[in-house]
Design a protein with these regions (language model features):
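Intrinsically disordered, low-complexity, charge-rich terminal extensions
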Residues: 1-302
Length: 302
């Protein structure tokens, strides 16, 4: 349940989050495992183990989990089987097969292999902050986040969202933090960053290297590079990598934070899940608020 990434989206129009209605809407897109001939399945699964509800809610915070099952068919296995069939049929009919015939054979090969294929399961969590009209997705890529949002849009019928963007250019703020040693008191820069130049391939990745290094500072001060990614620690609570597209990657809560609810018995799984969700959302909501303030608020949309 602990988020490892944070891609945040602004609801451009408030929605009515009636939970009974939400459950009904989610059930229309509920996850069902792949059948023998299915290559993939995508739908909602229960966030809380053993629950029939396809959402988990505490106060004004809602958690959803999109589950995707994909059959794994290695390309070399499909190719080997297909090549054998093509060769056999071409010899039998004494002619070269047309492109459309080869595609038909390939589809047949895939259908025959699917029942024997292994499955890969992927879960994507969405945290809906109805109080602040934000949706946070635990995804490391935009595609994965957009897929989950598309599923929610399909369930609700409408989902007016845009990626959260800050008013001030993030790379300018990040660069100034390092050059001017002006990080806010609640943040500590760790020894990891990515410096980007004007050319797309002109990237320097720094790891386990003090960012006050003279060479790094010279590049930034001369305007040859800007900081596009920066590893940070927030109030001894968590570490993360801030990206210039306003996404947070590699979120890691401190052990002391994750252990705060250890007094709850393991048998009380639902109570522990509830407490951990409240803890996590409280921390990440505060961090989001802090970052918005530091980056000049939210970018005005035209």
């Amino acid at each position: 349940m602990w988020f490892k990434n944070l891609m945040t989206y602004r609801l451009t129009k408030p929605l009515d989050w009636d939970l009974a209605q939400l459950q009904t809407q989610l059930e229309d897109c509920q996850f069902h495992p792949c059948g023998a001939q299915d290559q993939s399945k995508f739908g909602w699964s229960a966030p809380l183990r053993g629950s029939d509800l396809l959402y988990f809610s505490v106060g004004k915070q809602i958690l959803l989990v999109a589950k995707k099952e994909e059959k794994i068919l290695p390309a070399n296995v499909v190719k080997r089987e297909l090549d054998e069939r093509i060769e056999s049929l071409e010899q039998k009919e004494n002619r070269k097969l047309k492109k459309v015939e080869k595609q038909t054979l390939k589809d047949d090969v895939v259908m025959n292999l699917l029942p024997r294929a292994f499955s890969k399961n992927q879960h994507t969590a969405l945290w809906i902050d109805t109080e602040n009209n934000l949706i946070h997705v635990d995804a490391a890529s935009s595609k994965r986040a957009e897929d989950a949002l598309a599923l929610l849009r399909k369930s609700l019928g409408s989902l007016p969202v845009m990626p959260l963007a800050f008013a001030n250019e993030p790379c300018t703020i990040l660069t100034n933090w390092i050059v001017q040693d002006s990080l806010p008191h609640w943040l500590i820069a760790l020894e990891e960053a990515e410096l980007r130049g004007s050319q797309e391939d002109s990237v320097i990745r720094c790891k386990k290297q003090p960012l006050e290094n003279e060479e790094i500072l010279a590049l930034l001060q001369d305007g040859k590079k800007v900081v596009s990614k920066l590893a940070l620690e927030w109030e001894d609570t968590l570490t993360f990598v801030f990206n210039e597209d306003c996404t947070l990657k590699r979120l890691k809560l401190a052990d002391s934070v994750r252990e705060k609810n250890d007094d709850i018995l393991k048998e009380d799984f639902a109570q522990r899940f509830d407490a951990d969700f409240v803890l996590m959302t409280g921390i990440l909501a505060k961090l989001t608020e802090n970052l918005l303030g530091e980056f000049g608020g939210e970018k005005t949309r035209l």
